[in-house]
């Protein structure tokens, strides 16, 4: 997320509101959604990374978009920040009316925030559906490509992992 560190959150949001031609009264609404109301008049340079992430989301929410796209929204956050971001994202469809699209490489992280998933590989949609459908269709294993498959399988088996070498 970007913002002017020497300005407050409210000042940063005022700039974005002007750029988006959004009424400034929308600033209070988005600050409340992202739980930054009490810190709105602090300089952004004093914010934690999680607070900066939430400010970035507030900027995106100005003007009430129908779709919000977040790329790795929990990346770099500490455990408390991750939990806070998960909760915020999970509540956003109800609090904002927006559809939230999240890009992430961490399926475990996604499972804690969403009810529908889409899996892309090299630009091709491989799966789209509910988490339950994904779990039902998963193979329950992973395919590894290694230089020495028999040696890798033996090492995994020594660690108690079920492994097989395809013929």
Where are these regions (language model features)?
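Short, charged/small-residue-rich alpha-helical element at the C-terminal edge
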Residues: 140-167
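ABC transporter nucleotide-binding domains
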Residues: 1-102, 107-121, 125-127
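Short acidic-hydrophobic catalytic motif
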Residues: 132-136
């Amino acid at each position: 997320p970007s913002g002017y560190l020497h300005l407050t959150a409210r000042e940063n949001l005022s700039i974005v509101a002007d750029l988006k031609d959004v009424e400034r009264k929308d600033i209070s609404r988005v600050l409340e959604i992202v739980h930054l109301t009490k810190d709105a008049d602090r300089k952004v340079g004093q914010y934690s990374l999680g607070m900066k992430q939430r400010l970035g989301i507030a900027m995106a929410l100005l003007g009430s978009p129908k779709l919000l796209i977040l790329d790795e929204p929990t990346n770099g956050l500490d455990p408390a920040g991750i939990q806070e971001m998960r909760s915020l994202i999970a509540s956003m469809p109800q609090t904002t009316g927006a559809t939230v699209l999240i890009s992430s490489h961490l399926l475990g992280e996604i499972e804690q925030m969403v009810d529908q998933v889409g899996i892309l590989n090299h630009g091709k949609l491989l799966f789209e559906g509910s988490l339950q459908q994904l779990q039902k269709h998963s193979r329950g294993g992973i395919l590894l490509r290694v230089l020495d498959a028999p040696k890798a399988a033996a090492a995994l088996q020594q660690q108690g992992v079920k492994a097989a070498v395809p013929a």
